[in-house]
Amino acid sequence: MSKRGQPAWQAPEAVDRPKLKLFNSLTRQKEDFVPLDGNNVTWYSCGPTVYDASHMGHARSYISFDILRRILSDYFGYNIHYVMNITDIDDKIIRRARQNHLFDEYAAEAQKLPLDELLGQQKEVLQRFQDTCAKNTDPDKKIMLDKTLQRMNDAVEALTKAVGKGDEREISEKRLLYLNEAKDPISDWLDSLKGAQINDNAVFEALPRYWEDQFHNDMKSLNILPPDVLTRVSEYVPQIVTFIQKIIDNGLAYAANNSVYFDVNGFDKREKHHYAKLVPEAYGDTKSLQEGEGDLSIAEDRLSEKRSANDFALWKASKAGEPWWDSPWGKGRPGWHIECSAMASDIFGPTFDIHTGGVDLKFPHHDNELAQSEAAFNESEWVKYFLHTGHLTIAGCKMSKSLKNFVTIQEALKKHSATQLRLAFLLHSWKDTLDYSENTMEMATQYEKFLNEFFLNVKDLTRHVLSEEPRRQFDAWTEVEAALQKKFSNAQVQVHASLCDNIDTRSALDAIRELVSVSNVYIRDNKTRLNSLLLRNVATYITDLLHVFGAISGPRGGIGFPVSGGSGAQAAGADLETTVLPYVQSLAEFRYLVREQAKTLKAFDILKLCDDLRDNVLPNLGVRLEDKDIGKYAVKLVDRDSLLREREAKLAAEAEKAAEKERKKQAAAEAAAAKEAQRRVNPKEMFLAETEKYSAFDENGLPTHDKEGKEVSKGQIKKLQKLQQQQEQRYNEYLASIEKA
């Protein structure tokens, strides 16, 4: 017999799989993402200017960047080299540092100043601040300035009254109140008088160092990954000087009075260059260009140094009261836009993959970055993909101190957890406007609760498989499981397609919501024979995805959100499951047996103690114990703070229900009393008190003329007679009840 050969094999047909596309601001459309170097991605992100507390506007960008970074790295598998800068040399920092220093000195002296001298200085402060208010044209800022002016005037009035009373203690209190309320106007006044005298660089270093630390703490609190490389402007001045010199050598920058400016028109005329790639319609927007130059760099003498109003500063000559570094053009400091160009290029070279920033930085900052970098390298492209996060509004309004809706990150974290904030961002597109409001956060909170209940149920229902013999961990597979598995697979396909489509986390979470819903239906309909392995696979997939999104921190391998330990630090849920749960289950089993016996014996005091253990004692320990109609009970380890909030909400709901019941009872009693009082009215007198309607009545008490003296119509008299007849019936019933009594 001849040897048989293998039959022909039919290769499966290739299926088109979705490719990762990102919305590129350089083209204003979604583009296939193709890194310059295979699987390696170079990424530069604009960091903060550190002179004040980080707010939700910062969170909008940095949480979104973190989500994008994690997904590209942990889901798509790219090797990302992530660089972020810290702007610690800037006009805002210089002015704020100078003013803080001068105010602190003044406040210490002002406590000892004679009152007439202090009040005399106050008039100078007031005059300068009133001039500032008059010049301002920004409506929101004007509201804020007017409120500051009002508070300052009120504080001065209070101080003047205290002086009149001669009460030294009250004078001291009102003096301090004035200094606090007028801090900004006083600081500005002092800066105008003494700002040029500040020449200690330590003054300009302390402020950004402090706020940089606060920024990093905020990022850690939000579970945002630190950058691989952090660049500070103050540590890059020599490289920035070299970078500027390259632009000068290429004929696209010029020195003027110890400053250096970028030649926008000269750049735009060159064939390979194009100014304002991101926002071409903003070319010539001098207002935005001046804002980008900085508060200390828009005086007439500075503006007159430019060849064109479109030109912008690469190097600023420092005046008295400003920090400086040596350069070939004189003592000065870097311009804002050149900082990012020089630092990113120092790390990555002449081109890199991704540049990210807030949408408000498109023009002029990012457009100027592109221009000066392309000028330095004499290339037509510096960045391949420019990604911009959308604006953030507060309850539909622009975030503004004047509107009293300015929310710092720490203030936001007092109301909602980092997980809830991240879920709110995940439920919105990263490139669109996000409205931070009660409605937005309620959606995020409910989504978190929805997922958490699913995780807790799965862990409770499938916990036994971890302790049983290996063979018992595999349950029978039926059509029901096959249907759920198909929906599970479809959800994975939908999630992948969503993430490929410009990292659409909102659609991905919608697919997860649907998967959890069908899984909950499976649990409801198959309580007696659940396939534990399938349920755990679904829950583990969702948990891993939330890890990728940064919504869950800590080690992987468990199911659900981590449970907070007694110290408040997040412990690994799997560790608590292993170490704590056996003891809690023993307690729950003992309580169950006691409770069943108490039911039999009708021992209500013992039942009350069992309820107290469930409702008050265990929640304080992070344990939710649920009594079941079918089966014994369910034990779930939950974050203690979440449980306490649940309990408070439940108690509040019960209190509201009781209050509503009492309100209805009171309303019913009042209605009954009113009805009883109405029965006692003689029908002939029922209209006599309505003098605001009628002016004359007949012998039976029926109105004959209205308040203006006109006769009441026949139709109206018929209606009144009917009402009187009804009252007569009620009145007779009342008289009968008295006689009977």
Curated annotation (Swiss-Prot):
The modification Phosphoserine is found at residue 297. It comes from Drosophila melanogaster. GO terms for molecular function: ATP binding; cysteine-tRNA ligase activity; metal ion binding; tRNA binding. Residues 704-713 have a biased composition (Basic and acidic residues). A motif ('HIGH' region) lies at residues 48-58. Coiled coil: none annotated. The keyword Zinc applies. Its cofactor is Zn(2+). A motif ('KMSKS' region) lies at residues 398-402. GO terms for biological process: cysteinyl-tRNA aminoacylation. This is Cysteine--tRNA ligase, cytoplasmic. Zn(2+) binds at residues 46, 340, 365, 369. Its main location: cytoplasm. Residues 697-718 are annotated as: Disordered. GO terms for cellular component: cytoplasm. Its EC number is 6.1.1.16. It is found in: Cytoplasm. ATP binds at residue 401. PANTHER family: CYSTEINE--TRNA LIGASE, CYTOPLASMIC (PTHR10890:SF3), CYSTEINYL-TRNA SYNTHETASE (PTHR10890).
